[in-house]
Structure formats: C-alpha cells, structure tokens
C-alpha cells in the first residue's frame, strides 16, 4: 500500500538560538571581508556548515588555527573561559554566538560554585556545550543512571545539578531521580536547563506518535537534539530514522507505511523538510497535515558587540 499521508510535527526545525547564531554569521559576512572564522560548527547541521563554507567561512576546531587579529565567531554551543582568554591574547575580533540558554547554564555554574555547592552536570561527554560549561567551574559529569548511582562528590550535603540543554527529557528525568536517591538534599536549577525548543520538539513527536507508522527526523548525526528526537520516537515504539535530506531515505523503510511523520532538529533548515515532503508526494502521499503542538514566539537579540562592530565598520 502506498504512502497516503504526511504528518508534520510542529514546532520543528530552527530554534531561536540557531536563528540568532546563523544571523550573526550572515551579518558578519556582510560587514567584514573574508575569510571569517568560526570556532566549531556554528550549529550542528551539515547543510548550514556547507553553505557557509562556500561563502568563505572557515570552521576551525582550534583557535590556534585562527590568524592573529582575525574576525572569529564562537558557535552557538558555548566555549570555556580559556577560549575567551586565548582570543584576547591573539587580538581576535570576537562575536560570541553562544545561545543565551547555554549562557544561563554557565552563569548558574559560576553562581552555585561561589555558594559552595558540589556541581553535577548531566550531559554527553565531548559535546561542545558540555566542554564549555565544564570550563566554568569544577563539576562532575554524568551521562547515565549507572554513573549517577555510584557518583561521589566533595560535599554530598550540598549538591546541585545542571544539564546540557539538548537532552532527552525522559533520560534526564531518570538520571535526576537516581541522583536524588543518592543525594536526598540535592538542589535543582531555578528553571529547567533543558531548553524550551528541545522540550517542545520532543513533546510534538510524542503527540503524533499514535497517528503515524514511521517518523523521519531531519537533522545531522552530530546534532544532539536531532538524535534525541529519534530516540523519543523509538521509545514510543514507532520506527524512526535520522536523515540529512531526502536522498538518504531508504525505500525499504517505507514498506507497509501509510502515514509518515516528519520532524526536524533545532538546527535543520526548513528547506530540507520541504524536500522530504516533496519526496513523499512523489511516492504517493496526497494529504499533508501540520500538527501544531505548541506555538513558539521566543526571539533572542543579537549580541551588543555585533552592533558595536557594525558601527565601527560604517565609520571606518
């Protein structure tokens, strides 16, 4: 039986932090001569990175590769304090595109350390966001219930946990419960560290799960929030596949499938969602429905240093 219907999860795709980060690079490209350097991928999406690379943006994994005095943008995932110090010593002109919700976690780490807490960070080892947060203060990283159950901290009577912003809500809740059993007096951050966009996209997938036979998650493999969307669907019992675009969809995935769900990670451009929708139409889908689970109206202002650099460029 051919595909009959496509159900689009909404919200999906770009979050406010990604919109802001991409806009920062776009504006820097207009204001300054190439090349423009970006420390780490500006967002974890192959298409976004490839597009900027074609336009003389150079992505680097080490600030040592950035020439002294060059223009450099820090990625949306945040950086440790050492990156700011090295940039200053190299005379770099820096625009920090760190998502404000990641900055919030950094500031929490600094404050709780000053207040004498033992900090526990729930996150994925090696992720740029985790590296940046852990650079702010002494803390211990846990990524599983098993690690939480055996964790030893300097002051078990005064513990607070923080989280990476792009985690699975379900997995995070399980780890938090394990930590609470081990440290009954543990404090939570004032507001949830898992960001609004991560939560909304995961909730939208849960809401459409009973209406679909399979879900396609548009996003890149190194995108934490995209991987979590795939996991959320799988945990509901619905087959889920993570793809960058329509060319990666395997025909055998769609055998016996009538209703296809589609969502996209927070760094995936809508253009590639529509390309997948068009592909589903070519396979027989005649009904395309938007399922709106939550309306998002959040917008983040551009960083003040970008405004100052723009003024300097005009007066030069």
Task: Give the positions of each predicted feature.
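The feature marks the mature, well-folded catalytic cores of soluble enzymes
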Residues: 1-264, 270-316
């Amino acid at each position: 039986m051919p595909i009959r219907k496509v159900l689009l999860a909404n919200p999906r795709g770009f979050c406010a932090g990604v919109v802001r980060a991409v806009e920062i690079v776009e504006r820097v490209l207009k204001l300054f001569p190439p090349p423009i350097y970006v420390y780490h991928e500006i967002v974890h999406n192959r298409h976004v990175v490839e597009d900027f690379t074609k336009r003389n943006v150079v992505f680097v994994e080490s600030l040592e590769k950035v020439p002294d005095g060059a223009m450099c943008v820090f990625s949306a995932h945040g950086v440790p304090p050492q990156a700011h110090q090295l940039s200053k010593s190299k005379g770099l002109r820096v625009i920090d595109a760190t998502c404000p919700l990641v900055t919030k976690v950094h500031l929490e780490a600094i404050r709780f350390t000053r207040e004498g807490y033992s900090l526990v960070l729930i996150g994925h080892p090696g992720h740029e966001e985790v590296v940046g947060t852990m650079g702010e203060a002494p803390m211990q990283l846990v990524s599983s219930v098993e690690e939480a159950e055996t964790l030893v901290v300097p002051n078990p009577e005064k513990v607070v946990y923080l989280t990476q912003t792009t985690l699975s809500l379900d997995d995070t809740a399980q780890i938090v419960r394990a930590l609470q059993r081990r440290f009954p007096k543990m404090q939570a951050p004032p507001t949830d560290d898992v960001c609004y966009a991560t939560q909304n996209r995961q909730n939208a997938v849960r809401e459409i799960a009973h209406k679909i036979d399979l879900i396609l998650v548009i996003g890149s493999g190194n995108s934490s929030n995209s991987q979590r969307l795939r996991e959320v669907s799988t945990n509901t019992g619905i087959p889920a596949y993570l793809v960058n675009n329509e060319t990666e969809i395997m025909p055998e995935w769609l055998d016996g499938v009538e209703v296809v769900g589609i969502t996209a990670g927070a760094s995936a451009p809508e253009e590639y969602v529509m390309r997948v929708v068009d592909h589903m139409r070519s396979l027989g889908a005649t009904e395309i429905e938007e399922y709106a689970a939550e309306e998002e109206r959040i917008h983040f202002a551009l960083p003040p240093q970008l405004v100052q650099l723009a003024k300097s460029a005009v007066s030069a």
